[in-house]
Amino acid sequence: MPAHAIAAKPSDRFVNTEPVEPMTRSRSDAAEAAAQVPGAAGVLLEALRWRGSTARQIGLPAKLWCADFMNFVLRRAGGKGTQSRAARSFLDYGKKLDGPRVGAIAIFYRKGLNSGHVGVVRGTDGQGNPIVVSGNHGHTVMQATYPKSKVLAYVMPPNYVLEEMAAAARAAALKN
């Protein structure tokens, strides 16, 4: 172990002492940048830009707005959503995936035949539970871990599936 690590208090060993640069990008600049990122990464980046925002701040209805937020994010990232206010409308949207994938849309079960929740997958925890950025979690856009047992489906927006396939084909062609 380096001498400076041994001499430091355990709580100080991993402290970042580098100066932090303030972010000066506006949300419109960030949205423009996210729209230029190919595939599902653009959807995730756009969702992340709105963390901490309320429905009112975004301009969405204040009740049951997770699907509204998902459609909003898809539009801002250059895609097209379901245009429905129902979270479960995303069950019939895009290409179904066999598991969580960064940038995929996760649809969750909630009590009631037509109830649900929807958001963008950011990753998974150590037990395979999806970490999702969604609207109307605690009345804001928030990142949270959801139980994998509540997942109804993971889907990828249709145009992003094609973009990712094309990107994979280009990458394979460059290797040859």
Where are these regions (language model features)?
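Aromatic side chains
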Residues: F69-F72, F108-Y109, Y154
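N-terminal capping segments
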Residues: I6-T82, L91-D92, A168-N176
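Aromatic- and glycine-rich peptidoglycan recognition patches
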Residues: P10-D12, G94, V121-N176
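General "foldedness" signal
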Residues: Q57, P61, G78, S84, ...
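...with weaker cross-activation on analogous glycine-rich loops/strands in unrelated enzymes
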Residues: A41-L44, G79-M142
